[in-house]
Amino acid sequence: MKFTKMHGCGNDYVYVNLFEEKLDDPARVSIYVSDRHFGIGSDGLITIGPSDKADFRMRIYNADGSEAEMCGNGIRCVAKYVYDHKLTDKTEISVETGAGIKYLTLYVEENKVSQVRVDMGEPILTPGDIPVVKTDGSAYGDDYRVIDEPISAGNREWHMTCVSMGNPHAVVFVDDVAGFELEKYGPLFENHKMFPKRTNTEFVEILSRNEAKMRVWERGSAETWACGTGTCATVMACILNKKTDNKVLVHLRGGDLTIEYIPETNHVFMTGPATEVFSGEIDIM
């Protein structure tokens, strides 16, 4: 199997071009190639193929083989791959994802894509669509918004704000994100009974009205160095809690992303880098 390893702010995936390759069991392949000791090493597998609705279709598989609806860092790398590998010469493209069609603008330097701006669409705040439920398993009302909501995890009380960007996110504000015990608390949020489909969790430190630091515990992949949808969800949570303005620079372990919310259209835009690491071939056992 031919592959290309790429990353967006350190959020790394193995990319497979389905115009050239065939994968019978991508979930199993994702588990195999993601292993950082016995495989290639990545946060998961992303396939790039044809779409009858958009220019391209991407599918995302986590390191545990589960399929994700959307990946903001991953879709930027898809844009870089299809342009740099001559699958398109357009600098504005559409990509079909499990969370709908996304529209991307490619910024090209010396015939290579360096940055990508993604229209991530509208944030989803309806609890049943995220999904998130009450601690007793009952549903919130459709008009309710899970903002600064109490939650118990690890014998502690927290406050979270829940947003979906096509996949579920719980955002928690902390005083010191660098020293935060993510490995301890991340799994407790991911598998909490309030999240019927599990959740991604962002722990966020506010630096100013237009700057924040974030670490993320991804559903199915543990801590990753960046999460594009999570960064968008984080900025929406910041705005909903009146902690920042509508355009925020977010510092992640693997780099920086700029997120902008446009109230007039209710759309979130993400701008950030995409990097190709190497290409190769691997025998799938």
Task: Give residue spans per PLM region.
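A glycine-rich beta-to-alpha transition motif near the start of alpha/beta enzyme domains, typified by
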Residues: 1-112, 170-285
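N-terminal, positively charged, Ser/Thr/Ala/Gly-biased leader segments
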Residues: 1-22, 118, 136-163
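Hydrophobic alpha-helical segments and helix pairs
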Residues: 90-142
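Anionic-ligand binding region
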Residues: 132, 137-161, 172-194, 198
